[in-house]
Amino acid sequence: MNDLINFEIVTPLGVIYQGEVKSVTLPGSEGEFGVLKGHATLVSSLKSGVIDIEKADLNHELIAIDAGHAKVDEDKICVLAKGAVWVCGSDESEIEKNLAQAKDLIKSMSSDNAALAATFSKLDNARMH
């Protein structure tokens, strides 16, 4: 049984991510929520934060987004975001640079100090793994 769901992130600059994934955790305006294949259809606003993508090989990728919206169907997730930054890289300096850009993006869009602290903690923890 194929338990993968199609996922894409689109910004004004174009498609940032597109592929089949196992699950996605999104920063909903009312809190984080996870989506697997077969999820009920919904549309949700998203706050600035981190999208956690679990790929088919169970590895995770993180993408920091500015606020946006998500449309979820049983077999597809589409995120429309104002901006997005990958939190990964091929070496330590690239990862550090992308991490700093992700933090700057989120900091520029949020005044909620508790949400900022939680998001930065998630980004820092991801760097350790």
Swiss-Prot record:
One of its GO terms (cellular component) is proton-transporting ATP synthase complex. It is found in: Cell inner membrane. The keyword Cell membrane applies. It is a peripheral membrane protein. It comes from the Bacteria. It holds the Pfam family ATP-synt_DE_N. Keywords: ATP synthesis, Cell inner membrane, Cell membrane, CF(1), Hydrogen ion transport, Ion transport, Membrane, Transport. One of its GO terms (molecular function) is proton-transporting ATP synthase activity, rotational mechanism. The keyword Heme does not apply. Its main location: membrane. PANTHER family: ATP SYNTHASE DELTA/EPSILON CHAIN, ATP SYNTHASE EPSILON CHAIN, CHLOROPLASTIC. Belongs to the ATPase epsilon chain family. Produces ATP from ADP in the presence of a proton gradient across the membrane. F-type ATPases have 2 components, CF(1) - the catalytic core - and CF(0) - the membrane proton channel. CF(1) has five subunits: alpha(3), beta(3), gamma(1), delta(1), epsilon(1). CF(0) has three main subunits: a, b and c. This is ATP synthase epsilon chain.
